[in-house]
Amino acid sequence: MKKREFLKLGLLSVGAMTISNKSGALEYYPNKSDKKWAVLYGTWCGSSRDAAVWISEGMDGIANVFDVREDPDLSGYDHIVVGGSIRAGKVSDLLQEYLKKNRDRLRDKIRGLFVVCGNRMQPPGPEQVTGLIDNHLAILCDVSNELPKKVFLGRITYGLMDEDSRKMLQGFNMPEYDNLKREDCLTFGKEIIYRNMVSK
């Protein structure tokens, strides 16, 4: 292959990847559905990203999955699930800002809420659901507490953390761990679909 042809092919490949990344960055391509579903998440280290994808899988893959950092336009979606990772009792500032800015457009479309947290590696209970979802995420979304909701245990992966957070946790001798369970996320996705069908 001539050098000029090789360079042309290389530039075309890079261009194609750039276009596809801009048009659907971090969008998960699922199965088709007569209704448009989306899962929106905010994450620091990837735990909520994995939870969001697994929740969509539990819904038989009918939901697109969006990272709030992409500032997605969800106006074309009929049903939305919202969740995020917790630090100091709250989801990320970016997710909070997005929900406040889009509250009126999203409120009537939200079908489920979830958070991912460390909870000192202890199983979450009603106290965490009340504190992190009912009294925080549900308020940000301006929705009732009757929606499907779930608190998942998360993980610590130092290689995915910003330097300040990593140093702080390492200062407490916090080990890396992974308590996020795919099966729990799949089950929650199935619950969302079931509850939505029953409520029709």
Locate the predicted segments by residue.
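Short acidic low-complexity segments
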Residues: 65-75
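N-terminal beta1-alpha1 ligand-phosphate binding loop
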Residues: 21, 36-54
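N-terminal export signals
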Residues: 5-26
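FMN-binding flavodoxin-like domain, especially the glycine-rich phosphate-binding loop
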Residues: 25-35, 50, 57-62, 66, ...
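A broad, low-specificity signal for short, low-complexity segments enriched in glycine/proline
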Residues: 39-46, 73-75, 108-114
